[in-house]
Structure formats: structure tokens, C-alpha cells
Amino acid sequence: MKIEVPEEVFGIKKWEAKVKSNYNVASFIKEFVIEIPEEMDYKAGGYIQIEIPECDINYQDMDITSHHKEHPDDPQKFKLEWDNFNLWPLNMKNNETVERAYSMASYPAEGREIMLNVRIATPPWDGKKNDWMSVNPGVASSYIFSKKPGDTVTISGPYGEFFMNESDSEMLY
């Protein structure tokens, strides 16, 4: 019997990463940038897993400042939309440590910085009540939205199997 373990399994590491920035780039999407202590060898199309500890996140404490390069004159560009959708009273409670996978939006040559684009996962809308259903919002997206520069998060990676083949053939997606 011959057992083969893919090489990428041995390249997976766990890191404490420092949050460099966490700006809204759209009403419900964050550009979450973290820095790891050493470079990670990964390919475009790879992903990481982020560890979400037990936590209680109040949406009213989230900072939804828009990206200063995209909207230099309007740091509160997305606040009105959050007000209109009444997101501020939402609360996410996580009772156990879990991990969630996120594709990396950064390019491997960017060194120790890893960028994720994360959409907030709200509860479903209840049209009859004209309010959010009474279910927990997304655990990982709420956790990521709550992070501020200087905070630390635990990640592992790189993971992935869906990469472009090196060839001269035409590629269709």
C-alpha cells in the first residue's frame, strides 16, 4: 500500500496576525488587512481559515468607516445605509471556538500582508415583521467586522486546491 500526502498539507501553519486596517469598501463589505509574522507561500486562489473565539459582538460597536483612499471626503459614507436597514441593534453571540474559510484577495508577492474582502452576514429579513429574523448573524463576518487596527486574530493556512494550470491553453471560468 502506498499513501501519498499532498505537499501543501505540510505547508500549513497557524499564526497570530495583527490587524493593519479594516475599512468598509461598500455598504456591507470590509477590506480586512492583517499582517502575519512571516511570509506565507501561497498561490492565487488559496484561502486561509480564521479562528473565531467565544465572543459577544454588538453591531453598535462596529466601525464602518469608509476606505480613506476610496472616499477621502466622506468617512461615514455607509452609515446612512446601516441606519436605514437598522443594523445597529443586531448582536452576534458565539459560544464556541470555530474556524471559517476565506479566500485571500491579496497577491502572494505582497509578503506578510493578507487581505480578505468580507461581506457581513445579517440574519434573514422577515417581511411580515418588517425586521430581522431572531437568529444569530454570521459568526465570522461579525467577528471580522468588529476588529480594529492593532487587534490580533488567529489564522491558519495556506489551503487550496483550485489553482490555474500552467499551460498555453485558453482558460475559461
Language-model regions, residue ranges each:
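Low-complexity, polar/charged sequence tracts that form flexible coils or short amphipathic helices
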Residues: 164-167
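Ferredoxin-reductase
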Residues: 4-149
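Short, charged beta-turn/beta-strand-edge "cap" motif at the junction between a beta-strand
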Residues: 54-57, 157-162
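Conserved beta-strand elements of the Class I
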Residues: 170-173
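Structural and coupling elements of P-loop NTPases
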Residues: 153-155
